[in-house]
């Protein structure tokens, strides 16, 4: 089991500092105006409309608004970490649906890269896995906060799959020189990426999150003997997703004509 360094009281919270106050945020498209996002062929430095800090940007909205990764995800973390600490839910997909239903979680965005490992860690604990959940969540937030938005299209690695790898790395105490644990999270990430790629694009953070969690639950049972029950998920976000695959998505409702 992973041994995560204990921090002092000032660092004990799982949640990052809140970003500067902003205008009302939209759930889909641009957080500030709701207009569609325009992606660049190359990253460029831009100033965040919320915190004012300069950061590398791979997109703006049609009106040129840019919101950095930290501001995109910080508000949601402050709400879903306490929810997961208090939850007794054993189904990680059900937990994922509870978290993404929070109004602070957007249709797409890097917060999903953090939600995936945190949900899996909570479900692992709730199904009898031995883990100090608060410490594990703190470490998952730290690591997954470094996984930027848009990497599915720019790096060829979906952040949901990377989040599953973070989850398994924390469980096993993996590091770059750990002979036995080192390959295992990478196998899980590869498994998740195969499942995600098989469905096809364009991206949907809800779909890829569910697929990564499903593969991680099966992987966990096979490797560690901790079974996580998985219920059926019927998506209700297709109306908010401009790029929804509709009947091409395994979570799309099977409406009767």
Predicted segment positions?
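Short, flexible, mixed-charge glycine/proline-rich loop motifs
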Residues: 5-7, 18-27, 36-44, 59-62
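Residues immediately within or flanking Cys/His clusters that coordinate Zn2+
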Residues: 10, 27, 45, 58, ...
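Polybasic, low-complexity association/targeting segments
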Residues: 85-117, 202
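Conserved phosphate/anionic-ligand binding catalytic regions in large, soluble enzymes, centered on
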Residues: 112, 150-170
């Amino acid at each position: 089991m992973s041994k995560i360094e204990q921090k002092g009281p000032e660092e004990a919270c799982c949640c990052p500092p809140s970003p500067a106050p902003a205008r009302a945020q939209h759930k889909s498209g641009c957080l500030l105006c709701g207009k569609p996002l325009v992606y660049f062929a190359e990253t460029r430095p831009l100033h965040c409309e919320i915190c004012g800090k300069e950061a590398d940007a791979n997109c703006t909205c049609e009106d040129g608004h840019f919101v950095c990764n930290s501001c995109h995800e910080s508000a949601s973390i402050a709400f879903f970490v306490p929810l997961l600490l208090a939850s007794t839910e054993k189904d990680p997909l059900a937990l994922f649906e509870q978290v993404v239903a929070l109004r602070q979680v957007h249709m797409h965005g890097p917060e999903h890269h953090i939600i995936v490992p945190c949900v899996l860690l909570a479900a692992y604990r709730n199904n009898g896995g031995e883990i100090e959940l608060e410490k594990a969540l703190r470490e998952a937030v730290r690591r997954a906060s470094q996984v930027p938005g848009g990497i599915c299209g720019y790096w060829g690695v979906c952040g949901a799959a990377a989040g599953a790898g973070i989850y398994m790395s924390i469980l096993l105490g993996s590091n770059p020189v750990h002979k036995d644990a080192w390959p295992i999270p990478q196998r899980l990430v590869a498994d998740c990426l195969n499942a995600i790629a098989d469905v096809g694009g364009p991206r949907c953070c809800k779909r890829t999150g569910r697929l990564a969690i499903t593969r991680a639950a099966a992987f966990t049972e096979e490797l560690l003997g901790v079974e996580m029950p998985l219920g059926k998920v019927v998506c209700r976000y297709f109306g908010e997703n401009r790029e929804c695959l509709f009947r091409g998505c395994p979570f799309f409702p099977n409406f009767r004509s």
